[in-house]
């Protein structure tokens, strides 16, 4: 399906001084914006790696669950995406 115009990713929206963690994420978005013919395994894998890295970083620094509780033992929490996708569902 087509992505509505206000939500299309455009190449000119890029920060030159972007840290390495986020550069891969930006490039994955650029590939996603090109359409399904460009959604190779590498793009999907990179996107997943970037999301997982973000969750790990947030947990490492004790980011909130979303309900005001901090994460007690970030290294022991294996359901990183479960935390993210549960925000606002309580």
Curated annotation (Swiss-Prot):
Assigned keywords, A-Z: Protease inhibitor, Secreted
Gene Ontology annotations of biological process type: suppression of blood coagulation in another organism
GO molecular function: peptidase inhibitor activity
Disulphide bridges, residue numbers: none
Source organism superkingdom: Eukaryota
Any one GO cellular component localisation term in the record: extracellular region
UniProt subcellular location: Secreted
Function statement: Potent anticoagulant inhibiting the amidolytic activity of factor Xa (F10) (Ki=4nM) and reducing its ability to activate prothrombin (F2) in the prothrombinase complex (EC(50)=40nM).
Name listed for the protein in its UniProt record: Leech factor Xa inhibitor
UniProt organism field: Haementeria depressa
């Amino acid at each position: 399906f087509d992505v509505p115009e206000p939500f299309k990713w455009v190449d000119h929206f890029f920060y030159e001084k972007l840290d390495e963690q986020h550069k891969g994420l930006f490039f994955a978005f650029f590939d996603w914006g090109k359409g399904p013919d460009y959604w190779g395994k590498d793009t999907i894998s990179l996107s997943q790696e970037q999301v997982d890295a973000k969750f790990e970083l947030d947990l490492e620094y004790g980011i909130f669950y979303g309900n005001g509780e901090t994460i007690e033992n970030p290294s022991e929490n294996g359901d990183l995406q479960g935390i993210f996708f549960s925000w606002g569902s309580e």
